[in-house]
Amino acid sequence: TQRLDAIGAMVHPYFTISHAADMHSSGNVIRPGEKLELFRRHCVSSMERNDAIQFIRVRRESVVRDVLREFARFGRGNLEKRLIVMYEGESGVDAGGLTKDMFARFFHQIFAENVGMFVASEDGSSGTTGEIGLERGERTYLPSTKCELVSYMEALGKVLAKVVMDGHTIDAKFAPVLYKFLLLDTTTAAGMGSYGGGGGSSHGSGSSGDGSSTIGFSDLESFDGQLFAQLHDNILNRTITPEYADNLALDFEDLMPNGEHRVVTDANKIEYLNLRAQHILIGQRHRQLSAIRKGFHILPWNDNFRRFNEMDFRMLICGPSNIDAVTVIENIDFDHGDWKRSKTLEHVAKYLKSLEKEKDGLRKFLKFVTGSPGIPAMGLKKTEGQPAGPISF
């Protein structure tokens, strides 16, 4: 082993990185389950509910357009009412199932190429994003830079607000950085529209001080894994000499005022990578993302997202990434009905365990019996927005 000199000690991670500060800025001081439980209590006790009913009528073949048109005219008062869905030309009565079905169809179709609202990179995630739980090649979506339907983007934010308020579970394929943007404080989010905001000071993401991390180079990996790998190998892991920067035309053009006159060097390459990622992920689509954020924050969340990070937010609306038979069984009310002389419920439990061997088998079962492909992070509890409660037979 070699003894550190003074210069080496100044740059060594042991002396330059505070794991406690990193945990605090990323919202990881409190465990995810505790944060979600505290948030659920806020929704139950603090958020206003209206006894009135908000009807919407949609068509299955154009559910995205119809839902966005309805939510575009909604204000806070509309979102606080109980939502009742009616499908055009159908006589079904919504006891909660049609609402879940509508959300499932909506978030399945909104990412379709012909809708034109969202885009994904061709190669998707690199599959090494850890806690996010993305597979290699899995495509995640961000608003299209070509989409001028800003009012629809704002309406989408209201849809997400309703999903959160009522405790629904959706299968949303948003890039994690979208959740991160929704969690930023207003000043930071607005500032990212001008040349992507601050550059941060580390390989990962900087700290915004509001419980979430600002957007940086590491966030690019879950959206465009191939570009992330290229920048990682050709810039981060390279010694940037003047000749190398000149050959690759590496400068800060479009990333800061007069950026075309600032050359990338070995000293500022991390700042460059953070700004480049912010420009790709946020700057180019800032109007669309800001509209979603505006719609989402129409409800008074107060400080209840302050300690959330993007993984917490994703779990809040999508439920746990991994679902096993035990989790599903825990959300079944086996005391409902008279099954004392029947072994049916035993067979149900065995059947669910067999579905673990089939890809998405449990999610298909949940979609069939509940209308949603997942289980809420806090379980199937009867609430104002979820009148059905646990699964029962």
State what each model feature region is:
Residues 5-8, 12-15, 19, 107, ...:
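Alpha-helical repeat scaffolds in large eukaryotic proteins
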Residues 96-97, 115-122, 143, 168-174, ...:
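Intrinsically disordered, low-complexity regions enriched in proline, serine, glycine
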Residues 1-138, 194-196, 200-209, 213-215, ...:
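Extended low-complexity, proline/serine/acidic/glycine-rich cytosolic segments
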Residues 79, 89, 93-101, 146-150, ...:
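Intrinsic disorder
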Residues 77-89, 130-141, 154-158, 268-273, ...:
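Surface-exposed beta-strand-to-loop junctions
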Residues 126-130, 135-179, 184-190, 358:
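Alpha-helical catalytic/interaction cores of small GTPase-regulatory modules
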Residues 46-50, 175-393:
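C-terminal catalytic/scaffold cores in eukaryotic proteins
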